[in-house]
């Protein structure tokens, strides 16, 4: 359990190494991650560091959150995220102070979690990669239908989790073991190799990889 950061997805580009090999990277802007609360085992039952990112109008902030931010003496934030840390690491952090980008280094492997792009209502072929049925030989208007979804009188219901048509995307998903290609401390940019879930401007949670 180690500290992470919250950033915003800027988009994708490519960079070149010393040999001229191009690599596709995702650019993440790391806005100030201000510590809004420190949780300890004595008061909360576990050790964690809570960070606040972005800006929210006071008129758009609930009274509960407004009081929470006022207690930490920080401005209202758009997103609050919590990272569990070890008891030895908790002493390094202080409420009201930012978490620095220096906690990561180039070449390090990280796990990224974000909300995927919503695709709206989609059928089973697009949503779940179903094969589809025969195009000819007796098939009548059933080319893209999923087929049978039920059982017999027993159990007489459709099992939970059955792959069917519905809203595609707009779900929290994770990509593990992504390499940090480059870090720009001056501009607070993190360049990650490959793609990252979510749309441009979406919030991305980055933490050290659990499988590295």
Curated annotation (Swiss-Prot):
One of its GO terms (molecular function) is structural constituent of ribosome. The modification N5-methylglutamine is found at residue 153. GO terms for cellular component: cytosolic large ribosomal subunit. Residues 134-154 are annotated as: Disordered. Coiled coil: none annotated. One of its GO terms (biological process) is translation. It comes from the Bacteria. Methylated by PrmB. Keywords: Methylation, Ribonucleoprotein, Ribosomal protein, RNA-binding, rRNA-binding. InterPro entries: Ribosomal_uL3, Ribosomal_uL3_bac/org-type, Ribosomal_uL3_CS, Transl_B-barrel_sf. One of the primary rRNA binding proteins, it binds directly near the 3'-end of the 23S rRNA, where it nucleates assembly of the 50S subunit. Belongs to the universal ribosomal protein uL3 family. PANTHER family: 50S RIBOSOMAL PROTEIN L3, LARGE RIBOSOMAL SUBUNIT PROTEIN UL3C. Part of the 50S ribosomal subunit. Forms a cluster with proteins L14 and L19. This is Large ribosomal subunit protein uL3. It comes from Dichelobacter nodosus (strain VCS1703A). The gene is rplC.
